[in-house]
């Protein structure tokens, strides 16, 4: 008991000293931060729509916290909801609002997936953080629509944009889709290879072709990587020191898929992938007279085939640039095992000689006259001529020749497109597009005139390529007419953000020789090719 009294006596001075120190400390209430106005789930189309959020932040002591309040910072962090990381080795490695603003409005350049987003409010006076989570579901824009292949910036970085068809009533441009889908850094885009097939293997084939590498894209997601390089996927022996720059499929009538695929490399070698058997692949160069021998001549980066549907062609047209002559490929026989090219023999009463002695400027496959291929050739005097060779059936039928064209600027033009319903050639000159009537030798100048700061970079008619057009999921008259609209790609030379590209769609009135714009989309880089990703 004595010891207990002593303890109490010793404790009383301590209590007294605490009361004496009252007021020597800064006592304050800790603010409670609440976050309101964020959705539980935000749904966007990847590469096309923006992630938009404008939360309300409240302090129990200060009221509404605005984004200009110097005592607080705001951060949006994003990660895969299912696990793993967006950025390898960096958990929560993606910041949406790099400008630090409370409200976010930024493009969603992410692959299709469900993501977890964390909005963090930090009181920099105390270091205390308050966070709220919400989901972001990114859907794919790649299901159907116009794939727009572009070259971006001074380095011509390859990028794939798209005009996504989400429904009959809704289309939406999407940009730089492959940035998050594994495409290696490549430059100088050339074209998109598109070979639809109903066979389970390989199914629809989509190739991105560039001068620095060509890659197969996943037919649903567009994902790719170095292992999907065309040399690794479709060549028996990957060619060294050469890159495919042209790719096309030949359909000979099957309702399931093509007869053969062809590619031409930057070294002037041609290859054939004869389809119909498992494991079909590109073999040795076919620009030779005997299978497996070394190439005997170089070919131009064009292949002419019939684009009629149902398919009706058994042959393909090439141009020998060394000997300045047309050469041909045909379906296999004992003498021609699908892996050689043969010089074409002039027919009796020929319109022209297949050995032209001229430079091939351009060649295009069409549906006109049930499979006509047009070739633009230039003679030693710089004058240009147009030859028409029908590739339906066994092909190589000389059908038309056009000389002494009354077409101002044609001999200097580098962008061309031939119509498949009317005998019309379209060619570009600066910011203008002219229409030449092959039948009447008449030019309708400046049927399209773009702003003076724009330059035409691309002309094309996108013919649907399903083995049977009746397989297409949209059989409307309007949709079918789209393939006969002229696509005009242009670039604003004053653009400073690498997004000065515009794609316009123009209806052609072949009766009245008129052209009218239906619609256009902008925000692309410099357009190199456009192909419609069809659906059955």
PLM feature segments, named:
Residues 14-17:
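C-terminal motif of bacterial Sec signal peptides marking the signal peptidase cleavage site
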Residues 381-499:
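Intrinsically disordered, low-complexity segments enriched in Gly and acidic/Ser/Thr residues
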Residues 151-156, 213-215, 268-270, 323-324, ...:
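Short glycine/acidic-enriched loop and turn motifs that connect beta-strands
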Residues 143-145, 203-204, 258-260, 314, ...:
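Short coil/turn segments that connect the beta-strands within blades of beta-propeller domains
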Residues 177-184, 190, 201-416, 442-444, ...:
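Preference for solvent-exposed, low-hydrophobicity sequence contexts
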Residues 184-189, 347-359, 407-413, 451-471, ...:
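Repeat-based blade/solenoid architectures
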Residues 2-9:
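Sec-dependent signal peptide recognition
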């Amino acid at each position: 008991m004595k010891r207990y009294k002593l303890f109490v006596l010793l404790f009383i001075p301590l209590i007294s000293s605490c009361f004496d120190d009252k007021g020597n400390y800064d006592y304050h209430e800790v603010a409670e931060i609440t976050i309101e106005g964020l959705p539980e789930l935000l749904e966007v189309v990847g590469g096309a729509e923006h992630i938009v959020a404008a939360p309300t932040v409240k302090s129990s002591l200060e009221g509404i916290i605005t984004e200009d309040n110097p005592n607080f910072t705001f951060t949006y962090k994003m990660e895969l909801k299912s696990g793993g990381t967006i950025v390898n080795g960096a958990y929560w490695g993606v910041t949406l609002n790099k400008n630090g603003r409370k409200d976010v409005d930024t493009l969603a350049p992410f692959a299709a997936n469900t993501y977890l987003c964390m909005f963090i409010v930090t009181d920099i006076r105390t270091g205390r953080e308050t966070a709220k989570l919400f989901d972001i579901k990114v859907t794919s824009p790649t299901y159907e629509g116009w794939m727009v292949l572009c070259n971006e910036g001074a380095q011509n970085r390859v990028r794939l944009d798209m005009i996504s068809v989400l429904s009959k009533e809704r289309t939406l441009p999407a940009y730089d889709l492959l940035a998050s889908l594994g495409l290696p850094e490549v430059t100088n885009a050339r074209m998109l290879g598109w070979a639809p097939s109903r066979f389970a293997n390989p199914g629809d084939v989509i190739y991105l072709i560039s001068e620095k590498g060509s890659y197969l894209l996943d037919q649903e997601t567009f994902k790719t990587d170095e292992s999907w390089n065309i040399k690794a996927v479709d060549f028996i022996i990957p060619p060294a020191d050469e890159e495919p720059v042209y790719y096309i499929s030949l359909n000979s009538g099957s309702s399931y898929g093509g007869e053969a695929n062809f590619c031409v490399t930057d070294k002037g070698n041609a290859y054939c992938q004869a389809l119909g058997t498992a494991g079909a692949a590109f073999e040795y160069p076919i620009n030779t007279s005997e299978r497996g021998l070394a190439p005997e001549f170089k070919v131009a980066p064009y292949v002419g085939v019939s684009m009629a549907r149902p398919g009706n062609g058994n042959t393909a047209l090439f141009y020998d640039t060394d000997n300045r002559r047309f050469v041909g490929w045909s379906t296999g026989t004992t003498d021609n095992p699908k892996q050689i090219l043969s010089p074409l023999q002039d027919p009796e009463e020929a319109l022209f000689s297949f050995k032209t002695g001229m430079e091939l400027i351009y060649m295009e496959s069409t549906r006109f006259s049930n499979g006509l291929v047009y070739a633009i050739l230039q003679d030693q005097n710089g004058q240009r001529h147009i030859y028409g060779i029908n590739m339906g059936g066994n092909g190589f039928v000389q059908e038309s020749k056009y000389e002494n064209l009354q077409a101002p600027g044609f001999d200097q033009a580098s962008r061309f497109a031939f119509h498949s319903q009317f005998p019309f050639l379209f060619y570009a000159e600066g910011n203008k597009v002219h229409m030449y009537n092959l039948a009447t030798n008449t030019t309708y100048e400046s049927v399209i005139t773009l702003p003076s700061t724009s330059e035409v970079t691309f002309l094309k008619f996108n013919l649907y390529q399903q083995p049977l057009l009746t397989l297409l999921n949209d059989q409307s008259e309007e949709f079918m007419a789209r393939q006969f609209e002229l696509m005009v790609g242009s670039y604003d030379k004053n653009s400073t953000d690498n997004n000065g590209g515009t794609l316009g769609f123009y209806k052609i009135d072949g009766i009245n020789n008129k052209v009218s714009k239906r619609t256009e989309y902008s925000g692309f880089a410099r357009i190199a090719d456009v192909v419609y990703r069809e659906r059955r």
